[in-house]
């Protein structure tokens, strides 16, 4: 592998034309087998293999020979495992070949990330969840429409092979990829004619396919949006005179219809911003309703032309920020008008002017949070707390720590929202559910639990939101945080909650489209 990388640095074309011999290197499958064992031991307990069940490189080479046959009607990994009772998804041979295939395909793409695709060099990109909320806070007040959709993850295998073919010149190296993809597509558990490529499939192979697929989508979509709508994606502060300036220039461009007597007035400088989390992405547009309709019509055509995916235009939802709310991710996002008092002194006289500016206004979706807690059996659908029966076998400290961790996750995640008074209802539900769980465990009532354990136990468990603020900020900063937003970007706590909102939103969209 080191020799391959050394030749690849000298000549990048050599790296793309000679990938197929890597499939016959025993070191590659030794590394992939170790990766499979490490991943299995870290996530789920794996059955102990005997000495006869260890990986055989001779068997692996026989598997590669069957891959070269290119017969999709015959299963590639049937009766090739020494233990026929082991399922294909848990087979060490199948996973080792899959890991080796991923390692080989990652070689030509390891250096590609250093170079930007033509057309994205000037596009300001931030690839971290830390940048989502500051991005929304900066760009949303200067936008008036939102397009909400998601990246389709049901892909035909041949399309994925063609996307790799544009980057890899060694055609034989793509035969194993095609065989593995068709193997997944023809599996009994997959009833569709396509395969599912999504970040929630937590394997190295499918994560690599997802990252490559998203890279292809964004590398084509973003430059086209930039050229079509002439967006600059430039950052600018919330200057008060910006609103008045837009009002003055909006009559510069006049578009008249042939069959209509009305005229359409549009802005000369429309702007468009793109942000994605997981499978969902939103496009913030500053422009007219005609521009939004064009973009809604353009996205389905883009999917059909470039990715051969059929999607109806109604799957792209549009919202006007001044009237409707948009959910992303787990927040109810909208823009509200904020009065601003400006004092101007000219020639010894003081003038007071009232200006109206737009302000990013994220709201805590209390109803959705109660629905999430009801699904996890902390309360019923009306928000009435119930005991968590699944936790009654734990110790008292473990029960309190789990409830405390849930509350802190909610508090940290919604630290940047306005109107956090609704979170106290969530705190009440969690605290009372904790008390009922302890009472159910000790076969007593809430009053007896409070009397025996004391109120300090509940106070200690649900008072750490102040402990979070006090070490990092002064008393003045804590008081200022009540009226200003402070984003606590803690990825281990943000990701699970955001993924939960992602699943709920996907379920709502699916139910809406199935009606």
UniProtKB/Swiss-Prot annotation:
One Gene Ontology cellular component annotation held by this UniProt entry: chloroplast
Record-level GO BP terms: mRNA processing; RNA splicing; tRNA processing
Source organism per UniProt: Cedrus deodara (Deodar cedar)
Gene Ontology MF term list: RNA binding
Record field: transmembrane: none
Protein localization: Plastid, Chloroplast
Function: Usually encoded in the trnK tRNA gene intron. Probably assists in splicing its own and other chloroplast group II introns.
Family: Belongs to the intron maturase 2 family. MatK subfamily.
Pfam families in the record: Intron_maturas2 (PF01348), MatK_N (PF01824)
UniProt keywords, alphabetically: Chloroplast, mRNA processing, Plastid, RNA-binding, tRNA processing
UniProt KW Plastid keyword: yes
Protein name, UniProt field: Maturase K
Source organism, top-level taxon: Eukaryota
């Amino acid at each position: 592998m080191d020799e391959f990388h050394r030749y690849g640095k000298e000549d990048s074309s050599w790296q793309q034309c000679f990938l197929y011999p890597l499939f016959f290197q025993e070191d590659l499958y030794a590394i992939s087998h170790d990766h499979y064992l490490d991943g299995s031991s870290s996530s789920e307990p794996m059955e102990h293999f005997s000495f006869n069940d260890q990986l055989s490189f001779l068997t692996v080479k026989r598997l590669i020979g069957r891959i070269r046959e290119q017969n999709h009607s015959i299963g590639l990994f049937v009766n090739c495992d020494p233990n026929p009772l082991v399922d294909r998804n848990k087979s060490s041979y199948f996973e080792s070949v899959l890991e080796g295939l991923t390692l080989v395909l990652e070689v030509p793409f390891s250096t590609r990330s250093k170079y930007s695709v033509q057309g994205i060099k000037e596009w300001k990109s931030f690839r971290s969840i830390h940048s989502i909320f500051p991005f929304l806070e900066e760009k949303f007040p200067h936008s008036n429409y939102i397009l909400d959709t998601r990246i389709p993850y049901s892909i035909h295998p041949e399309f994925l092979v063609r996307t790799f073919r544009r980057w890899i010149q060694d055609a034989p190296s793509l035969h194993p990829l095609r065989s593995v993809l068709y193997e997944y597509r023809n599996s009994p558990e997959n009833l569709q004619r396509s395969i599912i490529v999504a970040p929630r499939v937590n394997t190295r192979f499918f994560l690599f396919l997802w990252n490559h697929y998203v890279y292809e989508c964004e590398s084509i979509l973003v430059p086209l949006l930039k050229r079509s709508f002439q967006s600059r994606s430039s950052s600018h502060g919330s200057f008060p005179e910006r609103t008045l300036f837009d009002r003055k220039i909006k009559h510069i461009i006049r578009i008249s219809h042939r069959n209509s007597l009305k005229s359409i007035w549009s802005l000369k400088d429309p702007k468009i911003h793109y942000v994605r989390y997981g499978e969902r992405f939103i496009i913030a547009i500053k422009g007219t309703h005609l521009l939004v309709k064009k973009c809604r019509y353009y996205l389905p055509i883009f999917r059909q032309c470039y990715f051969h995916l059929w999607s109806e235009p109604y799957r792209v939802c549009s919202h006007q920020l001044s009237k409707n709310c948009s959910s992303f991710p787990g927040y109810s996002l909208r823009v509200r008008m904020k009065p601003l008092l400006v004092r101007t002194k000219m020639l010894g006289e003081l003038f007071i002017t009232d200006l109206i500016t737009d302000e990013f206004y994220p709201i805590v979706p209390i109803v959705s949070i109660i629905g999430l807690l009801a699904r996890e059996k902390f309360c019923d659908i009306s928000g009435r707390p119930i005991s968590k029966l699944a936790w009654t076998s734990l110790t008292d400290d473990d029960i309190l720590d789990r409830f405390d961790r849930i509350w802190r996750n909610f508090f940290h995640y919604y630290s940047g929202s306005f109107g956090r008074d609704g979170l106290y209802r969530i705190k009440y539900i969690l605290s009372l559910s904790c008390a009922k769980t302890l009472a159910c465990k000790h076969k007593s009532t809430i009053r007896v639990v409070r009397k025996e354990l004391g109120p300090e136990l509940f106070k200690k468990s649900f008072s750490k939101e102040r402990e979070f603020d006090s070490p990092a900020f002064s008393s003045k900063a804590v008081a200022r945080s009540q009226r200003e937003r402070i984003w606590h970007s803690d990825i281990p706590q943000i990701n699970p909650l955001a993924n939960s909102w992602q699943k709920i939103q996907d379920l709502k969209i699916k139910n809406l489209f199935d009606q």
